[in-house]
Amino acid sequence: MTSTIGLGMPTAPAAVLAPRRKTRQLMVGSVGVGSDHPVSVQSMTTTKTHDVNATLQQIAQLTASGCDIVRVACPRQEDADALATIAKKSQIPVIADIHFQPRYIFAAIDAGCAAVRVNPGNIKEFDGRVKEVAKAAGAAGIPIRIGVNAGSLDKRMLEKYGKATPEALVESALWEASLFEEHGFGDIKISVKHNDPVIMVEAYRQLAAQCDYPLHLGVTEAGPAFQGTIKSAVAFGALLSEGIGDTIRVSLSAPPVEEVKVGTQILQSLNLRPRKLEIVSCPSCGRAQVDVYTLANEVTAGLEGMEVPLRVAVMGCVVNGPGEAREADLGVASGNGKGQIFVKGQVIKTVPEHQIVETLIEEAMRIAEEMGEQAGSGEPVVTVS
């Protein structure tokens, strides 16, 4: 007997908990930013920008990992001199990150960067240079991100509020935006970052209520990979589920590619980005009759790089195992030294425990191949005999 089974995630992601906040629209190079465009994932290179080859190599790695926009530091003249080559050869838009020296803003604009991030809290006499910056950026047709950080907040705000409160961050950002608007420049994106996700979330909520600028989300100095992932997921999840946020950067003390992986996973978890491969595995407990940790890790490693929207469930006992496996596109429910292999709710075979990983990988590859072949003719299906 032969039947056909539909596979794959929904073609259109489910709506988030709240409608997307309406914003003005910007173009950062080829990437649209604002409520009419998908939320984009950014990262920042960790190389010395003047080392052009190393920087371009890291940008290539970020591009391959799914990064949409990349930011590069520009603390020295030699870094500014390298921007033109980097901006020209990068496959994704390059944003120059400017602190302290206003002349590097103009160097970045002249170099053809897709946007410039300025920190009004530490650029010398920035308010007095806004007219020049607005004129140069407007002539080049590139946006400016006003990036306010708790750690480098304008001294005037610190004197007024005593510390980096949500109100202080928001007032600083909107003050600088108003100066640009006075000179006819409105292609502005704003960030108000803090290392405390609770303060950060409140700052963005206040900011979102007071303007229509696109917002770049970030928890600054979030920490090592584990801690930073948790902080960013909590903060971004809260805001994005409210429709707030147009670009994100997960700041981790880890390789930049890891930032992109986490950011992408956050968006996928909220159905703000089409899902690709998803491994569902149980946390294990005393009921487990198989080494779930090893099994899940081996399956994940074996399927790394798979681009199809496939949910694979790796379950360790008979309590939730069969149910979870049936809900997935492909799954295994393990117990008594063997595993039942499910494809979209139907058991297709039972294999010995030592063959589970190999069988899951083989079935996933087979399904992926069939999905690829049928991608142009509607929803993918798999034939089960």
Curated annotation (Swiss-Prot):
For this UniProt entry, the molecular function terms from Gene Ontology, in alphabetical order, are:
4 iron, 4 sulfur cluster binding; 4-hydroxy-3-methylbut-2-en-1-yl diphosphate synthase activity (ferredoxin); 4-hydroxy-3-methylbut-2-enyl-diphosphate synthase activity (flavodoxin); iron ion binding
Pathway in which the depicted protein is active: Isoprenoid biosynthesis; isopentenyl diphosphate biosynthesis via DXP pathway; isopentenyl diphosphate from 1-deoxy-D-xylulose 5-phosphate: step 5/6
Q: Does the keyword Disulfide bond apply?
A: no
Q: Which cofactor does it need?
A: [4Fe-4S] cluster
- Alphabetically ordered keywords of this record: 4Fe-4S, Iron, Iron-sulfur, Isoprene biosynthesis, Metal-binding, Oxidoreductase
- Reaction(s) catalyzed by this protein? (2E)-4-hydroxy-3-methylbut-2-enyl diphosphate + oxidized [flavodoxin] + H2O + 2 H(+) = 2-C-methyl-D-erythritol 2,4-cyclic diphosphate + reduced [flavodoxin]
- Database matches in Pfam families: GcpE
Query: How cofactor binds (record note)?
Result: Binds 1 [4Fe-4S] cluster.
**Class of the enzyme per the UniProt entry, highest EC level:** oxidoreductase
Any single biological process term in GO: terpenoid biosynthetic process
Spell out where the chain crosses the membrane.
Answer: none
EC number per UniProt = 1.17.7.3
Annotated residues that bind [4Fe-4S] cluster are located at: 282, 285, 317, 324
UniProt function note: Converts 2C-methyl-D-erythritol 2,4-cyclodiphosphate (ME-2,4cPP) into 1-hydroxy-2-methyl-2-(E)-butenyl 4-diphosphate.
Give the UniProt family note: Belongs to the IspG family.
Q: Which HAMAP family match?
A: IspG
Protein name as catalogued: 4-hydroxy-3-methylbut-2-en-1-yl diphosphate synthase (flavodoxin)
Organism lineage:
Bacteria, Bacillati, Actinomycetota, Actinomycetes, Mycobacteriales
Q: Which gene encodes it?
A: ispG
